[in-house]
Amino acid sequence: VDQRTFGYWLYAPWDKIAHIGIDPLEPDFDSAATARRLRAKRTAVKTALLDQTLTSGIGNIYADESLWDAQISPRKKASTLRQKDAVALLAAAQEVMTAALKVGGTSFDSLYVNVNGESGYFSRSLAAYGRAGQPCLRCGTPLERCIISGRSTHFCPHCQ
């Protein structure tokens, strides 16, 4: 259930949706090609990850978690990433999204449930998102929060 109404269903001819990037969990997702397109962006890497024309399905929470997992600062310019780091970031996104799906996604309260009214449990596994001020699970440094492109961003200032 999409309480905040970020999503919607649209039946449209292919040419109307062809600009949407492929989901990282699709079998034909090309990490190397997507990494090259990611590195062509002149924005913060967090902003690039949220760009649904690059790859679809990575939202704010999973972007923060993927960046933490890959040890990449969300403020880093996407264009300065090495190809191998961009590929590693996309692999981290795939791992984060797969782990989240296995436990029903990320629910913080009863407003965010599936069609059967069940909450997801990935929020119990978050390493970065929503943990500002708490110690980094990797190095112990207090996590920080900032705003990037209007979105809350959570990260470790030491190991990212």
Describe these PLM feature segments.
Residues 1-160:
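Structured catalytic/nucleic-acid-binding cores of DNA maintenance enzymes
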